[in-house]
């Protein structure tokens, strides 16, 4: 617990519902303490009904900014003054920066995923990846990957409302980037096999593998995976999902969602404080090296 908090400290929030399970306050405050910077990070239970008032409160109280999570990532965009290209493309914001009363919306989820790959020595720039999922995390990853220079992205999802939304995002990316992006029904297993065979990275950005779907995997046939494929899962609890277990048995390099969570948080800290987050220190303090 920091004992030097005074009137010069600035508050950074997290607006989501539910929120009590989040690891972000522990991670962020661990970093601020280590860096000895005058910031405190607190979680606030804010649903969509309370969001407009919460943004007014952020402005009125002069918060340095706020993280934004479900169910507010899309709705919050209409209350902000500026949006980054990634937010405009994805339609979702997970980070607000308050700069002298001007609120700018960022999305660091995709940044965190791409940085995780880079730190793990995985080069996907100019190459192809396959991603399963079409929700907020998947959309952020697809958008950032396209903006960063990934050549081709194959998206697989069930034909639900998210499918239609990600089709619209894919259309924007095809029109505004050099990346070829397309969406296919997840039930088409032969097409999924073909796209994975042509990809250097496979990403699971669905909830399959975490509670209440723990122990399940969208990939059930191990022969769809090869040893030189990098398999990533946005889930970090459990640390090793069924998909990652299958991939590891096939000799694949595997990455869980901890790296994405840490690096997206580091990107937020850079936005809010201008400082580089001591990621290795955080991993040690929070037991992520175990």
Regions found by a protein language model. Give the residues of each.
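Adenosine-phosphate binding glycine-rich loop
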Residues: 228-230, 234-290
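Glycine-rich adenosine-cofactor-binding loop
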Residues: 16, 105-110, 126-147, 157, ...
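NAD(P)-binding Rossmann-fold cofactor-contacting core
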Residues: 148-177
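Short helix-loop-beta connector
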Residues: 122-128, 225-227
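Rossmann-like adenosine-cofactor binding region
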Residues: 179-254
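Residues at the starts of beta-strands that form the adenosine-phosphate
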Residues: 11, 128, 151-152, 180
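Phosphate/diphosphate ligand-binding glycine-rich loop within oxidoreductases
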Residues: 3-120
């Amino acid at each position: 617990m920091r004992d030097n908090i005074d009137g010069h400290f600035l508050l950074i929030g997290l607006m989501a519902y539910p929120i009590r399970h989040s690891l972000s306050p522990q991670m962020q405050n661990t970093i601020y303490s280590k860096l000895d910077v005058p910031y405190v990070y607190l979680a606030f239970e804010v649903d969509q009904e309370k969001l407009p008032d919460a943004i007014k409160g952020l402005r009125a109280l002069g918060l340095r900014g706020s993280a934004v999570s479900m169910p507010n990532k899309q709705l919050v965009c209409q209350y902000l003054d500026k949006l980054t290209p990634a937010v405009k493309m994805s339609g979702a914001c997970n980070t607000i920066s308050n700069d002298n009363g001007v609120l700018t919306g960022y999305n660091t989820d995709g940044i965190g995923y791409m940085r995780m790959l880079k730190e793990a020595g995985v080069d996907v720039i100019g190459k192809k990846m396959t991603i399963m999922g079409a929700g907020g995390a998947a959309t952020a990853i697809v958008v950032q990957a396209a903006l960063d220079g990934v050549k081709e992205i194959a998206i697989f999802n069930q034909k639900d409302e998210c499918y239609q939304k990600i089709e619209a995002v894919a259309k924007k990316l095809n029109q505004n980037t050099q990346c070829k992006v397309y969406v296919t029904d997840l039930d088409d297993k032969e097409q999924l096999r073909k796209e994975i065979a042509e990809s250097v990275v496979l990403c699971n950005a669905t909830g399959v593998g975490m509670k209440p779907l723990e122990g399940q995997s969208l990939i059930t046939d191990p022969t769809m995976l090869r040893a030189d494929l990098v398999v990533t899962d946005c889930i970090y609890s459990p640390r090793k999902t069924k998909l990652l277990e299958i991939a590891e048995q096939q000799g694949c390099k595997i990455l869980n969602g901890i790296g994405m969570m840490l690096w997206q948080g580091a990107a937020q800290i850079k936005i809010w404080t201008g400082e580089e987050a001591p990621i290795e220190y955080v991993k040690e303090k929070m037991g992520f090296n175990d």
